[in-house]
Amino acid sequence: MKIKSLLCAAILALILLPAALCAAEITEEDMALGGIHIGDTRAEVEELYGNGNHYADGVDVWNGEDVGIHAIDYGASLHVTYRSSDRGWHVISVHLGVDDVNAYLSKPSEESQSLETPRGIHLDSTKEDLAKAYGCLPKPKCSNNAPPICGYCYDGETAQLAFYICAEHSPGIRAIWLHEK
């Protein structure tokens, strides 16, 4: 009886080991897109990409307080969202690529493909590239629309990095979203 229990525990450990290894490999340094990290100031982003074009403002509740939200388009389908604090405007989200399924038909521009994560993943990278760069491919979260868009999400301590692919239109990544948890 004890041998059977021990054998079951060993098999379970072997099954769970790849998931644990994958999660352990994602660091806070990996949580960047195009050189932008969660928490960077607006001035730091503008050093990299210029002033950009402001396109939206809003209000959000953060830590029980109403805070300002500011969104800027930096071209090449790069959009950054900031939250105001007593220290100024700080990055809470970076989005690169397309949101619309129809736009998945078009090839990303060379400029937008030049923006990448610290592990070299960019628009048009494939699922195989993700698995090679991050050591595993997480279970996809797929939309219910047709054709489905699947997100492959890697979690850090304070942020998540998600890669979106619509396999019916292209094997490559069409959108990347870095956001705080």
Where on the chain are the PLM-derived regions?
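Bacterial N-terminal signal peptides that target proteins for export
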Residues: M1-A10
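N-terminal periplasmic "start-of-domain" segments of outer-membrane beta-barrel proteins
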Residues: L105, S109-Q113
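A cross-family detector of function-defining hotspots
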Residues: D40-G97, E116-K181
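Sec-dependent signal peptide cleavage junction
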Residues: L17-E28
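Second-shell loop/turn segments in exported
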Residues: E29-G35, S114-I121
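Bacterial N-terminal signal peptides
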Residues: A9-A19
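Acetyl-CoA-dependent GNAT
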Residues: D100-N102
